[in-house]
């Protein structure tokens, strides 16, 4: 069996101003729920996704109206835009003409060779990558006849079939996804894909469900895949506001130490010793730090005796008690604060540390560019 390609050894592929694959951080993606031809609504949703930390966004392009809207949408957003195309190569060409940053299309499904060539040539001319989207629920008939039902081997065979079509046209800016709604099937498919080729992998558990069930299912499946060193970009698919997809993705990547641009909350599970409303405080602080683009760790704890010591790794935190709380940095108490202003004081400290971290990052960036 071939050796598995670790995410850092995959081919780097440019998507707009980002690079997916190679020694680059995992990229968080989502997809809009609006009608793409409704430019105003689509842009508004993308803006909310940007604010939540989405780095690449995909839009459905089911018809010419949607394809014609791409150029207007592109002008008003700040993150790379992906066109989701099914079957009609002309829609892919229109999207590319409109300035799309990536096309999701399966070359084997869009007809004769001249149609595939037209899309590949247009993408090549503009430096636009193609994502091959293999889905267990829509495998080719000959593959289902061969294997009897969706299998990981069948999914990899499908991916290799589409990859070969592009490679035969000397096109190599390829990203591949191997999505299934069955968690075990998805894990096996991604692992076998990582052994079969070195193109970047887009991770996802498709049709995973509602906010609660889908979050659990996606975390179980994608967590196992990420832990194997597989995956260069991901989308959490939920039957929910797409902003929730981004939030879950950020938390998942943070859990594996794979996100350097997101804040982390540490909070205790509560017990009978607690004398403050810790749950509402933790939720308020979590919401406050949710859009920060720096790796600050914030602790909210309910026990002034054990709290600071239990969260030594936190950059800043509070340990509450009735009447007053302790404000601490890296496990060391900074000062006591009255309970009624405890959260506001914590927010002020968070702002200071986040600004320091952002300035430090800019300084490092300038040094690297010199």
From Swiss-Prot:
- Name the Gene Ontology molecular function terms of this record: 4 iron, 4 sulfur cluster binding; 4-hydroxy-3-methylbut-2-en-1-yl diphosphate synthase activity (ferredoxin); 4-hydroxy-3-methylbut-2-enyl-diphosphate synthase activity (flavodoxin); iron ion binding
Q: Where does [4Fe-4S] cluster bind?
A: 268, 271, 303, 310
The record's catalysed reaction(s) read:
(2E)-4-hydroxy-3-methylbut-2-enyl diphosphate + oxidized [flavodoxin] + H2O + 2 H(+) = 2-C-methyl-D-erythritol 2,4-cyclic diphosphate + reduced [flavodoxin]
Q: Note the Pfam families from the entry.
A: GcpE
Entry keyword annotation includes Nuclease: no
Q: List, alphabetically, the InterPro entries matched.
A: Dihydropteroate_synth-like_sf, IspG_bac, IspG_bac-typ, NO2/SO3_Rdtase_4Fe4S_sf
Names of the cofactor(s): [4Fe-4S] cluster
Could you tell me the EC number(s) of this protein? Answer: 1.17.7.3
User: Does the entry feature the keyword Cytoplasm, yes or no?
Assistant: no
Q: List UniProt keywords, sorted A-Z.
A: 4Fe-4S, Iron, Iron-sulfur, Isoprene biosynthesis, Metal-binding, Oxidoreductase
Free-text remark on how the cofactor is bound: Binds 1 [4Fe-4S] cluster.
UniProt pathway: Isoprenoid biosynthesis; isopentenyl diphosphate biosynthesis via DXP pathway; isopentenyl diphosphate from 1-deoxy-D-xylulose 5-phosphate: step 5/6
Q: GO terms for biological process?
A: isopentenyl diphosphate biosynthetic process, methylerythritol 4-phosphate pathway; terpenoid biosynthetic process
Which purpose does this protein serve, as stated in its record?
A: Converts 2C-methyl-D-erythritol 2,4-cyclodiphosphate (ME-2,4cPP) into 1-hydroxy-2-methyl-2-(E)-butenyl 4-diphosphate.
Q: To which protein family does this belong? A: Belongs to the IspG family.
Q: What is this protein called?
A: 4-hydroxy-3-methylbut-2-en-1-yl diphosphate synthase (flavodoxin)
**Source organism of this protein record:** Bacillus thuringiensis (strain Al Hakam)
């Amino acid at each position: 069996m071939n050796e598995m390609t670790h995410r850092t050894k995959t081919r780097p592929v440019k998507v707009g101003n980002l690079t997916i694959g190679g020694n680059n951080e995992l990229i968080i993606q989502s997809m809009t729920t609006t009608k793409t031809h409704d430019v105003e609504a689509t842009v508004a949703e993308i803006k909310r996704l940007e604010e939540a930390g989405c780095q690449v966004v995909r839009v459905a392009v089911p018809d010419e109206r949607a394809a014609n809207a791409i150029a207007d949408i592109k002008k008003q957003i700040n993150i790379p835009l992906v066109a989701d195309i099914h079957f009609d190569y002309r829609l892919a060409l229109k999207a590319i003409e409109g300035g799309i940053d990536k096309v999701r299309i399966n070359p084997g499904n869009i007809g004769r060779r001249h149609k595939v060539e037209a899309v590949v040539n247009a993408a090549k001319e503009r430096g636009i990558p193609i994502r091959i989207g293999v889905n267990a629920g829509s495998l080719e008939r000959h593959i289902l006849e061969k294997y009897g039902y969706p299998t990981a081997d069948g999914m990899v065979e499908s991916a290799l079939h589409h990859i070969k079509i592009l490679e035969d046209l000397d096109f190599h800016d390829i990203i591949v996804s191997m999505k299934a709604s069955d968690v075990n099937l998805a894990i096996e498919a991604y692992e076998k894909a990582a052994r079969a080729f070195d193109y970047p992998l887009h991770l996802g558990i498709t049709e995973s469900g509602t906010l609660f069930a889908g979050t659990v299912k996606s975390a179980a499946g994608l967590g196992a895949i990420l832990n194997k060193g597989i995956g260069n970009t991901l989308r959490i698919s939920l039957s929910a506001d797409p902003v929730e997809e981004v939030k879950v993705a950020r938390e998942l990547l943070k859990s594996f130490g794979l996100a350097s641009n997101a804040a982390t909350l540490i909070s205790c599970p509560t017990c009978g010793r607690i004398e403050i409303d810790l749950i509402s405080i933790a939720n308020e602080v979590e919401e406050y730090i949710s859009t920060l683009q720096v790796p600050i760790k914030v602790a909210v704890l309910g026990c002034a005796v054990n709290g600071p010591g239990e969260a030594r790794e936190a950059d800043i935190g509070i340990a509450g008690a009735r009447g007053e709380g302790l404000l601490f940095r890296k496990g060391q108490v900074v000062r006591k604060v009255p309970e009624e202003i405890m959260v506001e004081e914590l927010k002020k400290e968070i702002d200071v540390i986040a600004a320091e971290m952002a300035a430090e990052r800019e300084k490092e960036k300038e040094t690297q560019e010199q």
